[in-house]
Amino acid sequence: MLLNKKSLDCISAFASSDPTRYMLQGVHIEASGNMIATDGHILGILTPGDSLEEKDFPSIGQSAGDVPALVPCTLAIDGIKALSRAIPTKSRMPIVKHALLDHTATNANGKAVFHVTDLENPQVVNVAKLDGTFPNYVAVMPKDPTVYRIVFDAELLKRVATAALTLGKDQKETAIELEFTASGLSAMKATTTNKDGQTLTAVVMPLRGSRPREEYGLLVPAIIEDTVTT
């Protein structure tokens, strides 16, 4: 299994920093390569890409032979962050900008064993496994049919969230209310009010062009039609 810095940094943002929530202070890795993290309020699931193959990773001491399936495990968030820092970022070879998870060695003990190298300085990074059962995150996944789909530029959403946090910087938490039209093809209105009564209203245009128009908006008619025909 190959993991790069972007994926590790991305999923780490969802882990808990609360010392009383032991099993949430880590990243759960499944045999499929999916990485899951949650703090109990927000859940992140990162699905691996398939652009690179493990067999092309430089041989630097990883276990030989057939690669067994990974036994799912939860890795301590501090170790995940240390692993991210160890991954080379300046190599011209894309595969070197990854850490290779040694399935055989990881399955055999209480730590995950990763190999990283810049082709001159190979090293092994061990990340402690958390002893316990990761929450059943599948139970909180939405199961009802999707009735609405709309896409926004992540940078625009970040600007709205940053502005809202600036307005409510002295508050324990800042809420943003989102309003959509019935079609979902027009702008979204985001509103936040701070404790001083100041209100910010932001209007965010949807991202267009990345998918066919018919894939966006209210999907209820299609669902009703499927229900009737079946």
What positions do the PLM features span?
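DNA polymerase processivity clamps
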Residues: M1-T230
